[in-house]
Amino acid sequence: MNEGPNNGTDTYDYHLKTYGKDLVYDDFIRNFTASAWDPKEWVDLFADAGANYFVQVSKHHDGYTLFDLPENVTKRTSVALSPHRNLVKELFDASKKYQPHLHRAVYYSLPEWFHPDYKKYGFSIWPGGNATNPFINESLPYTGYVPLTDYVTDKIVPEMDTLAEMGTEIMWCDIGGPNRTTEFASAWFNKAAEQNRQVVMNARCGLPGDFDTPEYARYNGVQVRKWESNLGMDPFSYGYNRATPLASYLNASSIVTSLIDIISKNGNFLLDVGPTANGTIVDIEQQHLRQAGLWIKSHAEAIFNTTYWFVTPEEGENIRFTISPDAFYIHSLVKPSSTLTLSSPIPWVDGDSVTVVGGKMHGTVVPVHRLNNGSIALIVSKEVSAGDQYAWVFKIPY
């Protein structure tokens, strides 16, 4: 929209045919009603999915914030504009009341595509300056705009300070660019320490931060530095896309196997759900999240409070390893046959027991023996194979 006329895309053609040339981006703000939004339903869903934390978008690149701000900072907020609600606060409050074990966090974009005062800092596809109506090539006003002396000092700093005051435990920044994150982080970390709270920051705030964030991607091997893979349940969008076929959404099996692969390499898994304009999460996403959550809760000991096996995270395409202070865990990402053979050096010696984790056969002892070539063979009965889905986990207690 900064680039003026562009008639070479499907989006351009669809917009022109459906809405006409005079309806522009900011006109869609009024369609965002959140009329069916229930923050309790959301946090209950997150808990049902087996999550330990959630990251709520507080402001994306369009500069529309989902929380309240002083009028001398911006009026481009969900409080000043439709739906006239402080959505981040409502979600945080619901989490504290109904699912207090969930850690609360926010996503925050430092730059804004079209903020007039970002123009002097603009770079790449974040040039700042007013958007252009691509159909008639005219500059557009920036709804809710308040003139600022300096975008970084007068916009980024008070927004990040407000989110910190609201109690975010993760500052999940995006894009980077000009910032005053050093000063912000110093005050935020020190205050959290005084309150005996743990807070972290990703690597996109302008500092190296505490963890890296590959997007719609993951690492092939163990990373000693913590990382978090983020992707949408919709393979094409972090938002809601009505054109996405239901069969294309990430299913429970893919959620579980992705989670196992990621944690075996010292990562976390951040899974995006894109709500509709009325604040509901589509049924297919809810179904898949809850199905995955049943598996995650049943196998929690092999997932949470574990870390990577320093020798190797995996064996081939379908075996992953995790460890805890008390046990070594073998994860099979496919249903095992009658014999599961492992050639990797794992901490098993003659006489050690191996048991099933999770599923209908939880706690069942699995016979094990060492082959002549030094490999370990687990004898997996039909009952054990049939007793689980998505992934099969075996435990060697220390």
Q: Where would I find each of the regions flagged by the language model?
A:
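Mature catalytic domains of secreted/periplasmic carbohydrate-active enzymes
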Residues: 1-398
